[in-house]
Design a protein with these regions (language model features):
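N-terminal strand-loop element at the rim of the active site
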Residues: 6, 12-72, 163, 239
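A conserved mid-protein helix/loop that constitutes part of the nucleotide-sugar donor-binding site
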Residues: 20-31, 200-223, 245, 330, ...
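Glycosyltransferase donor-sugar binding loop
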Residues: 43-48, 171, 205, 230-245
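Short His-centered aromatic/hydrophobic patch
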Residues: 94-100, 118
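A conserved, positively charged/aromatic
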Residues: 108, 114-145, 151
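Nucleotide-activated donor-binding/catalytic signature segment of Leloir-type glycosyltransferases, i.e.
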Residues: 244-264
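Short hydrophobic beta-strand element within catalytic cores of glycosyltransferases
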Residues: 302-305, 315
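Conserved acidic donor-binding segment of nucleotide-sugar-dependent glycosyltransferases
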Residues: 317-318, 322-329, 338-344
Length: 381
């Protein structure tokens, strides 16, 4: 860098700081900025992960950025412009569409570089929706979180491919380390979730929403006809009470209610992963990246993913896990059976391969370093 990094300030904008991949990315980049000697600012409506940013030295500026109301978005342009001026912001980085519109015009007004991270495919069912999404490619640099997202952008938007940089999401390898999970925590959770010690645990982490494929996994477990399987759905329902009730109804229909646990999001996911004999990502639509797959593999868990989206970039089929035909309960059932049938030697080999790949390709440090490099390139133009 040719500039004094200690006076260099980055403002990230996003709707909230509760949960999800874009929130994790914002928190991690904020911490990396502070560690490097730069100044991190995050504008959002706040949330439960806000303290992680402030604890690391970053500053959170709370106001609503998630509204699609044009008047509020226009007001946010002026709010962001004042923040840019007050804190001498050098780059503004948007991680969501509504904040990106305000950030784009604020960046133009104040003459600073604008970065976006394309976190999902976003719905493009009509021209108006596609126009709304297009703000994510109007930046000076677009970060795609996987090769799948990179290809999606090029296929659907008019953009110079050289403006896009693919930076795979990363995880905290130290946090997701199976050696650091205490046996006492495992015993506690086995009791808490009423899991018999001789059971095989199948885990599906993620929001309780239809496209995550919970019903598909129920069908796959039913096809196995095994009474020794306990399946955990771990994630927030976010008020989707109808879907939750539908899952309960299907479990009753298949007489599987005693084999399933629907559990709210847990802070200690490393222990949840270690409980599992198999971790499944059964998403019906392609995952933009698939962070839970990486987390599970870093923990050395046998992992199964639908063969589309980011999952197919993370798993090497048969070496670090298995890929199944998307939406195919029979194929998913077969892969679960393979995972549960591994002998100790083959299970250990798979764990070694999975951990090595997660550490090498999907670690937090690499993700943050590549993102900060994007900032540096724009700053030095």
């Amino acid at each position: 860098m040719n500039l004094d990094i200690k006076s260099y300030s980055v403002l990230q904008v996003l709707p909230h700081l509760n949960s999800g991949g874009l929130v994790s990315g914002a928190v991690e980049i904020s911490e990396a900025l502070q560690k490097t000697g730069m100044n991190s600012f995050v504008a959002s409506a706040g949330g439960r992960r806000e303290r992680e940013i402030t604890k690391a030295g970053g500053k959170v500026i709370n106001f609503s950025l998630g509204s699609k109301n044009p008047i509020i978005m226009l007001l946010n342009v002026y709010k962001l412009s004042r923040i840019i001026k007050k804190y001498k912001i050098n780059i503004i980085h948007a991680r969501s569409r509504a904040p990106a519109w305000s950030a784009y015009f604020a960046a133009k007004k104040m003459g600073i570089p604008f970065v976006t991270t394309f976190h999902g495919t976003y719905s493009i069912q009509n021209k108006l929706k596609k126009k709304y999404n297009s703000i994510m490619v109007k930046s000076d640099r677009v970060i795609a979180i996987s090769r799948f997202i990179n290809n999606h952008i090029l296929s659907n938007y008019n953009i110079d491919k050289d403006k896009i940089v693919t930076i795979h999401r990363g995880i905290n390898i130290e946090r997701f380390n199976y050696l650091k999970v205490a046996d006492e925590r495992l015993i506690y959770l086995l009791k808490k979730f009423n899991i018999p010690e001789d059971s095989f645990v199948v885990l599906l982490p993620g929001r309780i929403t239809r496209w995550k494929g919970h019903i598909l996994l129920i069908e796959a477990i039913f096809k196995l006809q095994r009474s020794d399987i306990i399946c955990l759905f771990v994630g927030d329902s976010q008020g989707r009470n109808k879907y939750y009730a539908e899952l309960e109804k299907i479990l009753n229909k298949f007489k599987l209610k005693n084999n399933f646990r629907i559990i709210p999001n847990q802070s200690d996911m490393a222990t949840i992963y270690k409980l599992a004999d198999v971790v499944v990502s059964s998403s019906l639509d392609p995952e933009a990246f698939g962070r839970v797959i990486v987390e599970a593999q870093a923990m050395g868990r046998p992992t199964i993913s639908a063969n589309h989206g980011g999952g197919s970039e993370i798993i090497i089929d048969g070496l670090t896990g298995w890929l199944f035909k998307p939406g195919d309960a029979d194929d998913l059932s077969d892969k679960i059976n393979k995972a549960l049938s591994l002998n100790k030697d083959n299970r250990d080999k798979l764990a070694i391969n999975a951990i090595k790949r997660a550490k090498l390709n999907f670690n937090n440090e690499t993700m943050c370093a590549k993102t900060l490099q994007v900032y540096a390139e724009l700053a030095n133009k």
